[in-house]
Amino acid sequence: MTYALELSRLTKTYSGGVQALKGIDLNVEAGDFYALLGPNGAGKSTTIGIISSLVNKSGGSVRVFGYDLEKEVVNAKRQLGLVPQEFNFNPFETVLQIVVNQAGYYGVERREAQQRAEKYLTQLDLWGKRNERARMLSGGMKRRLMIARALMHEPKLLILDEPTAGVDIELRRSMWT
């Protein structure tokens, strides 16, 4: 069976000997919903960073839909959509520019990118803000923009790091339905 995500004996030791991860094993089947829960400093963001290849692991292996993250990084990353904890888009670009540009990074044709932008921005109630600069959005709208951006190449696996941070109760409810 090919899993959506396979972590095998995953370890991470930072400089100074701080061990963030110690032998993590996890198999996630396609279609499953998982949450990493734990206190601050438990290694949740480190794990997400390794899965998304933003943080180097110290040991173990990561496979995304069968692709080894070390040996087949391009194929593995094409399967992933990441919504990071921090907003990391150009605040001077418009909402539409941000999502269409993201699709382009993955080779999505401009016409298709425009269609996907309308689809995801509408689903996330941002279509009416498509021509606004990202810096003008509220925190909750920025969070939804990050989700729309992560969906633009239609990944098979969506990774969300603190997806409801700074989001009001009503939006949290709508995000999970």
Label the model's feature ranges:
Residues 158-161:
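Catalytic Walker B motif of ABC-type/P-loop ATPase nucleotide-binding domains
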Residues 60-68, 75-76:
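Conserved ABC transporter NBD signature motif
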Residues 133-137:
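Conserved ABC ATPase signature
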